[in-house]
Swiss-Prot record:
GO terms of biological process kind: hydrogen peroxide catabolic process
Protein name: Hemoglobin fetal subunit beta
Taxonomic source organism: Ovis aries (Sheep)
GO MF terms held by the record: haptoglobin binding; heme binding; hemoglobin alpha binding; metal ion binding; organic acid binding; oxygen binding; oxygen carrier activity; peroxidase activity
Subunit structure: Heterotetramer of two alpha chains and two beta chains.
Keywords, ordered alphabetically: Heme, Iron, Metal-binding, Oxygen transport, Transport
Binding site for heme b: H62, H91
Length: 145
């Protein structure tokens, strides 16, 4: 659970995020760092190298879509399970995504935010974001339980 101040800090920083760039980088890094996650994206074309993945327009497009969903979830921080119920159902029942991948993507997102925002991404802000990405990962994994 986040305090009102913690929520405000997350929302304030996220308002500065370019979802297309950050989403593409986060998903791209996930696919590079954890290559077994690529099996869910084989239809995206060339995923043969880090350069191919990070330059792949389908990876960038889906990363933007993922971050837009994350952004919508920030509007419902007190009901993340409700906010992500339909996506949890899709990823569990139709796509059969390993729920551990949600945690991995959240951690990669924190890395990308730290890289992009440098000193502005303080340890306290990192802790707040870590709470949020953990909550989102748990909400997305909810259907699996």
């Amino acid at each position: 659970m986040l305090t009102a101040e913690e929520k405000a800090s997350v929302i304030s920083l996220f308002a500065k995020v370019n979802v297309e760039e950050v989403g593409g980088e986060a998903l791209g890094r996930l696919l590079v760092v954890y290559p077994w996650t690529q099996r869910f994206f084989e239809h995206f074309g060339d995923l043969s190298s880090a350069d191919a993945i990070l330059g792949n327009p389908k990876v960038k497009g889906h990363g933007k879509k993922v971050l837009n969903s994350f952004s919508e979830g920030l509007k419902q921080l007190d009901d993340l399970k409700g906010a992500f119920a339909s996506l949890s159902e899709l990823h569990c029942d139709k796509l059969h995504v390993d729920p551990e991948n949600f945690r991995l993507l959240g951690n990669v997102l924190v890395v990308v935010l730290a890289r992009r925002f440098g000193g502005e991404f303080t340890p306290e802000l990192q802790a707040n974001f870590q709470k949020v990405v953990t909550g989102v990962a748990n909400a997305l994994a909810h259907r699996y339980h």
